[in-house]
Amino acid sequence: MPPSGPRAALFLLPSLLLLRAVLAVPLERGAPKEENPATESPDTGLYYHRYLQEVINVLETDGHFREKLQAANAEDIKSGKLSRELDFVSHHVRTKLDELKRQEVSRLRMLLKAKMDAQQEPNIQLDHLNLLKQFEHLDPQNQHTFEARDLELLIQTATRDLAQYDAAHHEEFKRYEMLKEHERRRYLESLGEEQRKEAERKLEEQQRRHREHPKVNVPGSQAQLKEVWEELDGLDPNRFNPKTFFILHDINSDGVLDEQELEALFTKELEKVYDPKNEDDDMREMEEERLRMREHVMKNVDTNQDRLVTLEEFLASTQRKEFGDTGEGWEQGKAGVPLPMAPVLTLQTVEMHPAYTEEELRRFEEELAAREAELNAKAQRLSQETEALGRSQGRLEAQKRELQQAVLQMEQRKQQQQSHNNPAPGPEGQLKFHPDTDDVPVPAPAGDQKDVDASEKKVPEQTPEPPQLDSQHL
């Protein structure tokens, strides 16, 4: 069972209306009980859950507001009369509430900016004031302080949103069931005749097993509560006492039975039909039946419709004639249609009594076909774009290879030129010098060589000049 406590009960209910029951003085017990450790409030599923929780936590610290809340009735809370008491809370509490609102406005602005950035082009000026108007749980005209109008809007919005939570759950389950049936029919169409008959036989066998189980009692009836009293509480069924039963199952001792505490009472009945160890049993169907059972009890027992069952409401329900009627058991009918607390016909599971009509299934299949066609078209476009990118990549790779080949050829030619201009060293490392061909004398032809030799022979020898006499010797 999920955690429950004063704040846990609060967040399962539509608004601050629940605070009155949460803060009520607990029933006297024979022996004092140790205080249960504080548990975190379960998530309501609202996108402003944290803001709602923090506002309530702050308001709980103010003695004046707490006193007015205990004296208020449901109409005072829903009409906004309680919200006006915010003007009399302490300055310290108002300061905390102002800071909470500024943080919430900042958070919503960030969400809006992220959303707009994902949908629009950059550099577009946003009108945050108009955008904040789509959030109905705060006053967008005043973005800095928490006023009575903010508390009123928070109560109204949470009341509406949480009241629609069960309806949204039923709609989600309906779509889940239609998708299952759609896939089952498509699977049967893909089979041969013999295989299809075998699959249909297995389905009929599964449905037959669901019909063969112990009787499921009407939720909230004497028979159902006595079974819990005997099998879960281990007490004598002949000594059943409604007040004692209420106290035993008020787990957090806050004087009321919240939705989670009520749903825990139906586990024994649901286990008669659904076995978690059996793969053929759909646990989502079991939880849908649990929700329907809780709605049925709330409709017949919760007279002020605050989604809490007080001791007075519980005891009053046990005085009705229907409380002792046995009938044939609980009928599991269409999802979201609570049945009256009265004798009903034989049990029908969700599989035997679908949560949808054939017309709804037809429209759902048309919606799936349109979505599938859209996805196929998108997949085809992506495939074509992928092929185009592949071809472009191939061309780029070819150009890259050509460029690399050209660079390689240029390097080779450069190396060849350098090796031609620079002689290679000899075996002992010395350079081999090759004289320039322009400085080497060209030998004359053989005939000319004789003339050259003869001319050399005809050259007369030069006679030495006579010595000159010095003038001093004369």
UniProtKB/Swiss-Prot annotation:
Binding site for Ca(2+) 1: D250, N252, D254, E261
GO process terms (BP): small GTPase-mediated signal transduction
Superkingdom: Eukaryota
Positions of Ca(2+) 2 binding: D302, N304, D306, E313
Phosphoserine: residues bearing it: S83, S383, S471
Summary of the tissues where the protein is detected: Expressed in bone where it is detected in the soft tissue in the center of the osteon and in the osteocyte lacuna (at protein level).
Entry's Gene Ontology cellular component terms: endoplasmic reticulum-Golgi intermediate compartment; extracellular region; Golgi apparatus; membrane
InterPro entries, A to Z: EF-hand-dom_pair, EF_Hand_1_Ca_BS, EF_hand_dom, Nucleobindin
Residues modified to Phosphothreonine: T145
Alphabetized PANTHER family for the sequence: NUCLEOBINDIN, NUCLEOBINDIN-1
Family: Belongs to the nucleobindin family.
Protein name: Nucleobindin-1
The gene coding this protein: NUCB1
